[in-house]
Swiss-Prot record:
PANTHER family in the record: COATOMER SUBUNIT BETA
Residues carrying N6-acetyllysine: K494
GO cellular component, as recorded: COPI vesicle coat; endoplasmic reticulum-Golgi intermediate compartment; Golgi membrane; plasma membrane
HEAT repeat extents: 96-131, 132-168, 240-276, 277-314, 316-353, 396-433
Gene name tied to this protein: COPB1
Protein name: Coatomer subunit beta
InterPro entries assigned: ARM-like, ARM-type_fold, Clathrin/coatomer_adapt-like_N, Coatomer_bsu_C, COPB1, COPB1_appendage_platform_dom
Any one GO molecular-function label of the UniProt entry: structural molecule activity
Additional facts recorded: Brefeldin A induces dissociation from the Golgi of the beta-COP and presumably the other coatomer subunits.
Predominant cellular place of this UniProt entry's protein: cytoplasm
Organism the protein comes from: Pongo abelii
Membrane topology, record value: Peripheral membrane protein
GO biological process: endoplasmic reticulum to Golgi vesicle-mediated transport; intra-Golgi vesicle-mediated transport; intracellular protein transport
General function of this protein: The coatomer is a cytosolic protein complex that binds to dilysine motifs and reversibly associates with Golgi non-clathrin-coated vesicles, which further mediate biosynthetic protein transport from the ER, via the Golgi up to the trans Golgi network. Coatomer complex is required for budding from Golgi membranes, and is essential for the retrograde Golgi-to-ER transport of dilysine-tagged proteins.
Amino acid sequence: MTAAENVCYTLINVPMDSEPPSEISLKNDLEKGDVKSKTEALKKVIIMILNGEKLPGLLMTIIRFVLPLQDHTIKKLLLVFWEIVPKTTPDGRLLHEMILVCDAYRKDLQHPNEFIRGSTLRFLCKLKEAELLEPLMPAIRACLEHRHSYVRRNAVLAIYTIYRNFEHLIPDAPELIHDFLVDEKDASCKRNAFMMLIHADQDRALDYLSTCIDQVQTFGDILQLVIVELIYKACHANPSERARFIRCIYNLLQSSSPAVKYEAAGTLVTLSSAPTAIKAAAQCYIDLIIKESDNNVKLIVLDRLIELKEHPAHERVLQDLVMDILRVLSTPDLEVRKKTLQLALDLVSSRNVEELVIVLKKEVIKTNNVSEHEDTDKYRQLLVRTLHSCSVRFPDMAANVIPVLMEFLSDNNEAAAADVLEFVREAIQRFDNLRMLIVEKMLEVFHAIKSVKIYRGALWILGEYCSTKEDIQSVMTEIRRSLGEIPIVESEIKKEAGELKPEEEITVGPVQKLVTEMGTYATQSALSSSRPTKKEEDRPPLRGFLLDGDFFVAASLATTLTKIALRYVALVQEKKKQNSFVAEAMLLMATILHLGKSSLPKKPITDDDVDRISLCLKVLSECSPLMNDIFNKECRQSLSHMLSAKLEEEKLSQKKESEKRNVTVQPDDPISFMQLTAKNEMNCKEDQFQLSLLAAMGNTQRKEAADPLASKLNKVTQLTGFSDPVYAEAYVHVNQYDIVLDVLVVNQTSDTLQNCTLELATLGDLKLVEKPSPLTLAPHDFANIKANVKVASTENGIIFGNIVYDVSGAASDRNCVVLSDIHIDIMDYIQPATCTDAEFRQMWAEFEWENKVTVNTNMIDLNDYLRHILKSTNMKCLTPEKALSGYCGFMAANLYARSIFGEDALANVSIEKPIHQGPDAAVTGHIRIRAKSQGMALSLGDKINLSQKKTSI
């Protein structure tokens, strides 16, 4: 018998503050009390029997005085009582009193009330005594013809259970149920009958389905789901049946029930690899995503589409459905949009890239018309990155994309503008034919850029790629326009002197006294000192940045001016024009230096920026060929090398992914003789319905699922010692959002232990769902207790507690055995993830909790230590492999991971190997961990410290 078929008893809480009733008082209430008293007494009897009391003297009393009553509440309680009361003698023979009970069952099966009949039939499903069931078989059969569907469907369940447990009692059950199914009209009755045939006589079920295969679409959804399950199981066991039933699955794709459509699509994919079948299933998935309102459903179905894409043969079919997949972008949820865009990007080809770009451009324009929202900004970023990737993969599309995206350089959202700038920088370097277009568009939006970071990037691009005399002059004009009147210091002093004009004076409104909640006076003024003055609003952008004290942009400007001046000198032969242009560039640098040294800016210029601007002045004053090469050639080559390395890294990553996806089994993989299949082939060989059932019951583990030979015994935690009167050990089963403790409790004494209770408490972000119920342990007996602990976040948690019990017949106080602590491993909740460098830096700046861990290890190789940290923390290294290759005595790497609760974890590894200590010197350094929550940062730090201790031993 499987775990799913075991009897599940209802646990009833007993108030401990009242005295347990005596058998005599209960007998008196059951014999002489009214209906209410008998009801209460029967409840107490049930609770006492559940807690281990025998009460044999009350059995005949209940049969004589309670069983004949017609009260519905008492009848329901009696069903519970007959389920739990011992029905056999110690030697296993049926009690004589149960013959009387059997007669009562028969009368209830013929009762005019359909609820009593149905409840009795449900109760009979739980009986394990064939002697009790045998006299009832005619009455159970008769219930199949009852007028009410509630009775009929429970009669089917009773017949199925009896046939499964005691086939000799009703050997013709499959034939009986088949005849019932043919004439039945009620959907729930047909569903139960069909389900029985699936498990009892699958051939008969298939024959019935063949007779009504054209009417399947008219059936109710509960019956359609069972039909899908039958077809899946039949074809899984016997592939030759596929041709017989695949048309039925196609028809069920048109069902009105989303659940049926989803299951039918999943079954169709397993039955056939034909392009038409894959296309029909994918189209069904897409329709479900669009029509379903629940975002969780959308994400689940999207995952099924992504699984389809992983198969090389299916990927080609899905490429034709890219435009249909993009319809999902109408969903406002960001996570759904993110997955959809990634899927579309993976499927895009030269055949449909043009249509994809048109749709994405429309989506980008739509984000302009939507009111500003955090998700809108993030969605715009996703669109920009997708268009960026499309343009890199399909260069012909870049010319269509650039004009639309360039407008976002002036966007208030700096993150989206930064993504556009990154795309423009890559496009202008890769595509020579687009340089003129990009420079032209850049000059158009240059004056409207609001962010200093974007302004710096735009300056660099213009300085690097303006190659004609006209473009260089246009750049100089834009810079002068953005800088305003020069010299800056003199013009600003003049403005300050004439600043307070009547129309610009700030007027102060009348002062009003207010009384606060504490009874004190508060003064309210109409003066708004934070309002920017008209003078500040009218400042040109570059001038505003400089007066705010941001002189890093000035250093970038000096480099740009130097580049275009050197290029202008090379292009123009007239000495006068050369000198004039160079002098103008030097004047701009000098006036910025003057401003930086004055008291006008909010923050003074830094020494680094002064050095950079001074260096540029010196380069322009000398104009040496060496400096010309450095500024106009080496800079561009550096960018080219960086982009090439990035592209190579992406190709390598894609190659690894494709190899991992395409190779089902390696030649040197070990064979698991238990299954005779490769480990990574097992998923497709398993019955998916059985797998989902096991997952729902919590019988599969994420780590063990990959290897069927892995044992649960590896995770057993001993809670008490072998010399303790009660021995306990637990298997910690970690699910996604909860932990199940399966505790084995063994009574090692010769006494009966009563009220043996497992008392648990938690430390950290853990919560005990329910308190385990007390139990009674016979001498040297054992029992399993399960406890559920809910997990709310990724934080090191501790479960501790004790076992308390009473010794039968002893007058002493309760005994207590203290349990060892159970430490919950956070690695079960952390998964490697990836993000861009910009996102990493942004999160690093935003996260407020930092944990600095000092490296303490015996390891002598930097790369080995990094690999050890990655394995210990389950994080992903974002630093490219090429950047970590070679040996120079020190290493810096960025790590990233996400928890299943959506928490981000960042780490920066900064390590070195002291050369002066010789080749056997241990690795030293620090690991800085940053997270949004304190628990995450501390937990990861503890994990690293623990792993370092293990390596140091």
